[in-house]
């Protein structure tokens, strides 16, 4: 599973870099883990050069059974007895006239707890789009709707890969609501007021001199997950951090051994992010081109028909970050800016930052985010 976690991690950072390049000021929030597993499910049915390109983009080595490893990984992350709420909707929708193989459908269920549903895009395009949106809404308990906007599918659509995630975690120890107040958040162009949460407690924190930034780890309940925030120093642009970022560096920068636990004054904005992506172009930029081209796509492990390309890869994610924790906020004497606290570390996320939600047991990046525009 270590190989797979590493492959998924590298893919996550590749995805983050491409998405962040597209629009420097846009908020980002996506689940690389679910994009990887959804694509790996499609990879089950890929052959020839299509399969080679997919395995290269996903960083999958030929060693061991990739699908078996994904099965183990997904079972661990999607456990039901957790303190965090993770609702996922992942399914492949195929044009019913494509004659999909039952062996492929069975493997989707076995390894990915996901299915292939056959619809008639040719006969009822709009009906299919609505059906897919309704299914996603139901699976995410209404948190995510409209994963496919009007015009995203057409009568010629053959394969649509849909993937949506809703995440709500509770902090190990909550932020006390009575200290949340409006504070300015500085973007490159302007200042906007955000609801800034405050907590004065022991956290693991570090400073990376290489890129001039602070690193803070905030544990979620039961410490199964944690949010790791990369916050550039006031004098450094977030783009500098993004440019330097690689999966290896992220592991080194956020290694618990290199962080020091101490009393920290933490200021973190309340967040509610809902982000949507059509990933076809992004994946083509990464080198996965044949899968999307009618004359080159080889999915003979999935269907008996030739010329069945992937038409759409839709991904949508929703996260809420607020004060809620599983334990009451400890009664701390809050001294925000008093002189006696000058020596104490301060982590004030009042300008753009990156954040990652880690699943510790599997060393997986569950989510990647950038908050740059309140």
Swiss-Prot record:
SMART domains: SERPIN. One of its GO terms (biological process) is epithelial cell-cell adhesion. The record marks 339-340 as: Reactive bond. One of its GO terms (molecular function) is serine-type endopeptidase inhibitor activity. The keyword Cytoplasm applies. One of its GO terms (cellular component) is extracellular space. It holds the Pfam family Serpin. SUPFAM superfamilies: Serpins (SSF56574). Keywords: Cytoplasm, Protease inhibitor, Serine protease inhibitor. InterPro entries: Serpin_B9/Maspin, Serpin_CS, Serpin_dom, Serpin_fam, Serpin_sf, Serpin_sf_1, Serpin_sf_2. It is found in: Cytoplasm. Belongs to the serpin family. Ov-serpin subfamily. Has an important role in epithelial desmosome-mediated cell-cell adhesion. PANTHER family: SERINE PROTEASE INHIBITOR, SERPIN, SERPIN B8. This is Serpin B8. It comes from Mus musculus. The lineage of its organism: Eukaryota, Metazoa, Chordata, Craniata, Vertebrata.
């Amino acid at each position: 599973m270590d190989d797979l976690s590493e492959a998924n991690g590298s893919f996550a950072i590749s995805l983050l870099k491409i998405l962040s390049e597209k629009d420097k000021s846009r908020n980002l929030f996506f689940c690389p883990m679910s994009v990887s597993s959804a694509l790996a499910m499609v990879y089950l049915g890929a052959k020839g050069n299509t399969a080679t390109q997919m395995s290269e983009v996903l960083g999958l080595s030929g060693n061991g059974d990739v699908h078996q490893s994904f099965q183990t990984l997904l079972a661990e992350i999607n456990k039901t007895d957790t303190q965090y709420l993770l609702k996922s909707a992942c399914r492949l929708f195929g044009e019913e006239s494509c004659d999909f193989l039952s062996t492929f459908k069975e493997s989707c269920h076995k390894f990915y707890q996901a299915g292939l549903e056959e619809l008639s895009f040719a006969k009822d395009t709009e009906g299919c789009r609505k059906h897919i949106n309704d299914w996603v809404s139901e699976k995410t308990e209404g948190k995510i709707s409209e994963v496919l906007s009007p015009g995203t599918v057409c009568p010629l659509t053959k394969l649509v890969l849909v993937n949506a995630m809703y995440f709500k975690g509770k902090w190990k120890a909550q932020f006390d609501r009575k200290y949340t107040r409006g504070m300015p958040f500085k973007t490159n162009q302007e200042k906007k007021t955000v609801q800034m949460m405050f907590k004065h407690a022991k956290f693991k924190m570090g400073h990376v001199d290489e890129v001039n930034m602070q690193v803070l780890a905030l544990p979620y309940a039961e410490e199964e997950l944690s949010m790791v925030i990369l916050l550039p120093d006031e004098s450094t642009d977030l783009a500098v951090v993004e440019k330097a970022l690689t999966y290896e560096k992220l592991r080194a920068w956020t290694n618990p051994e290199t962080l020091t636990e101490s009393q920290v004054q933490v200021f973190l904005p309340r967040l509610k992010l809902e982000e949507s992506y059509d990933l076809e172009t992004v994946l083509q930029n990464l080198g996965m081109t044949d899968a999307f081209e009618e004359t080159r796509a080889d999915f003979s492990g999935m269907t008996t028909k030739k010329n069945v390309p992937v038409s759409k890869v839709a991904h949508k994610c929703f996260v809420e970050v607020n004060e809620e924790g599983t334990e009451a906020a400890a009664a701390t004497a809050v001294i925000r800016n008093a002189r006696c606290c000058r020596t104490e570390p301060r982590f004030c996320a009042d300008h753009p930052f990156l954040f990652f939600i880690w699943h510790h047991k599997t060393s997986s990046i569950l989510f990647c985010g950038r908050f740059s525009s309140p």
